[in-house]
Design a protein with these regions (language model features):
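Anion (oxyanion) recognition and catalysis
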Residues: 7, 51, 252
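Short hydrophobic/aromatic-enriched beta-strand-loop microsegments
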Residues: 13-17, 56-62, 120-122, 218-225
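Asp-based, Mg2+/Mn2+-dependent phosphohydrolase catalytic module
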Residues: 24-33, 43-89
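Short His-Asn-centered micro-motif
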Residues: 1, 19-20, 40-43, 98, ...
Length: 370
């Protein structure tokens, strides 16, 4: 009956998914599972449940739901116009990444670039990284990451070299306080937009310097950062955090809105093995094969059968927050041993406490393999 009605109305669809109309949770569960952005129904209870689950929901106007205050449309054309407008209202994104550091950055960059229907990617800025054991200086790391970004974009047939900017050549904790292309671009983009999301998957140096140079951006940006460890852990000697602790302090001491995805015991749950990657991505594209190759031997940790693909967590959080559980806390202080000290200050920040590994990887494989 539904198919016949859709065909008679000339309504095009990719998939037809039927749910139990008597189960008010059924549509919300399916929307979350399939990462559906917008839902429409004429049932107030179904719409209300979808709204409770963070799904953008429209009520089709009927005589029996006219007393509800849920946003509604009266005609299918109105819904079409709403969806068209919604799709054009993409979130402005800056990705701050140390792309050549490990294999997870390449996965995250690919994942982001495969979701341009959701995001307006304003810039990709190169975060600093270095390794004494590999004799890689920050300056060399900048070049390696910059070239890696361009290589991945070329595989995806994207010419966005004008959106890639080199960043800091040292860390604030080493006395570095210079502006650079990345810092200047972060400020420029933040000031021109009403809202910009900065996705940090490396040391937070560029972002901290931008806040320090132009405090006006504080109320115009939101930071989503992978760094540190879970609340209550003995220390934060995690790579992104320990590279530039002074930069973390600058961000914490500002009033900027920030969500932190901790590594130990939270994002570490994204561990996966090489066989699962091969089963889902092998031979889907030249880029997918490269990602598998980098996963197997990232040139730093040596050959490994399984790893955590850390950085995809930040992209996934922006795609669907329903895959995560969070906790809002008073912004902690950072002790000398890098551990967090609880406070009662009024500044609140958000910590991710749990994630749905399976849903994240299901979406990553689907998008990356397209």
């Amino acid at each position: 009956m539904t198919k016949k009605w859709l065909d008679n109305k000339g309504i095009y669809y990719d998939d037809l998914i039927l749910t139990d109309a008597y189960d008010k949770h059924a549509k919300a569960e399916k929307c979350i599972e399939l990462n559906i952005d917008i839902m429409i129904d004429d049932s107030v209870r179904i719409c209300s449940n979808c709204i409770e689950n963070g799904i953008t929901t429209i009520l089709m106007d009927t005589p029996y739901n006219r007393y509800s205050n849920i946003q509604r449309v009266k005609r299918w054309k109105d819904f079409y116009d709403y969806v068209s407008s919604y799709k054009n209202n993409k979130r402005n994104i800056i990705l701050d990444t140390d792309t050549y550091n490990e294999c997870d950055d390449q996965f995250a960059l690919t994942y982001l670039l495969k979701n341009q229907d959701k995001f307006n990617i304003e810039a990709i800025t190169v975060a600093p990284y270095s390794h004494q054991s590999r004799n890689v200086s920050v300056r060399e790391g900048q070049e390696l990451s910059y070239n890696e970004i361009l290589k991945i974009c070329k595989w995806l047939n994207l010419n966005i070299s004008n959106k890639v900017f080199k960043g800091s050549m040292n860390y604030i904790q080493n006395g570095y306080n210079e502006t650079n292309d990345a810092v200047n671009k972060i400020i420029e983009i933040a000031l021109k937009n009403d809202k910009t999301y900065i996705l940090g998957i490396g040391a937070i140096t560029n972002i901290a310097l931008a806040l320090k140079k132009e405090p006006k951006i504080i109320n115009k940006i939101e930071i989503i950062w992978l760094g540190g460890n879970e609340l209550g852990y003995k220390d934060n000697l995690e790579y992104n955090f320990k590279q530039d602790i002074e930069a973390v302090k600058i961000v914490f001491n500002s009033k900027v809105k920030i969500t932190i995805l901790p590594c130990k015991n939270v994002v570490s749950n994204l561990k996966i093995d090489i066989n699962t990657l091969k089963n889902n991505l092998e031979n889907k594209s030249e880029l997918c094969n490269y990602l598998i190759e980098r996963f197997y031997d990232d040139g730093y940790h040596g050959v490994q059968e399984s790893r955590v693909i850390w950085d995809i967590s930040v992209i996934a959080y922006m795609i669907n927050k329903n895959w995560f559980e969070t906790k809002e806390i008073n912004c902690p202080k950072i002790n000398n041993d890098t551990s967090y000290k609880p406070t009662n200050n009024k500044r609140m920040i958000t910590f991710v406490t749990k994630l749905d590994r399976d849903k994240i990887y299901k979406d990553l494989f689907k998008k990356s393999g397209e």
